[in-house]
Amino acid sequence: MNIAYRFRIYPTEEQKILLGKTFGCCRFLYNQMLNDKIREYEKTKKMLKNTPAMYKKEYPFLKEIDSLALANVQLHLEKAYKNFFRDSKIGFPRFKSKHHSKNSYTTNVVNGNILVESKRIRLPKLKWIAMKKHREPAEGLRLKSVTVSMEPSGKYFASLLYEGYSCENQAAGPDYSTAKILGIDYAMQGMAVFSEKVETEEAGFFRKNEKRLAREQRKLSRCVRGSHNYELQKKKVARCHEKIRNQRRDHLHKLSRKIADGYDAAAVEDIDMKAMGQCLHFGKSVQDNGYGMFREMLDYKLAWKGKKMIKVDRFFPSSKKCCKCGRIKKELKLSERVYHCVCGNKMDRDRNAAINIREEARRMLTA
């Protein structure tokens, strides 16, 4: 199993120039290769098998950067095509924009060309770069590749991908009829409601910083596009977004770790977050609480410990079903936040749904 560690790096001005050139060359090569594939298919109805080496003679500036970064461009383009042919909903590979694409490139470990020390990292063409290594990777891992990226705020990061990470073995598995399973139901307020009490911090980081972000964006709108002040203010806006994103990710990492450590399994409803944000006009709430990101984090952290995350069918009547007697209501409006049943059960509708999700997952595991 692979595991990645992300560290901040501090390149010199000379190294920043070379990094910028590498980002640009990778983007340029990706667009050129994609364009040639499209043109060849339009002419011959066959897929062109082009490689980075085919472009170095015509564009000699490609020789100035790491050749492995260019090789990974080819791999990324081929993966984009495979994803498209596997599922057309993903969409056809798109050209990368200079102003809206992520600035990053990936290089591989070959013959010791990458070295990692406590306070620095050596990369091809860049030599040694200062790095803040805030944690040590697990022992016994082998470095596979490094992805260098630049955030809109101007910060640089190196993501080190290691292979050989071993998950905790739970081959026997617990007795799921009595195992500790946590049911999780999506909620607009607070991201999720659990089948039992789980201490968590209040989320909604975007709304907490919304006024400050709006103020910085207003200042940006008054600046002349392309001016020095415009570029400075643009970075301030980017730092606001970065802070919100970091707060959200930190909160979700801590919460998912607590659940993965404390439970044998977790059960969630298999809902389409993208469709929910578009159809129910709750886009801001859906994106702010990061429920989709939380599910991904919880899934791989449970897998690390040899545990399971069970996805209950989205059409399972978790909200309409009474968790006490099992009766199912014919209708339940979204505005009804408290669940009432003829058996006398009265509780928060999301809590009722979370309990039903937990018990349905237990049934699925013991079936």
Role assignments for model-derived ranges:
Residues M1-A367:
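Nucleic-acid substrate recognition interfaces
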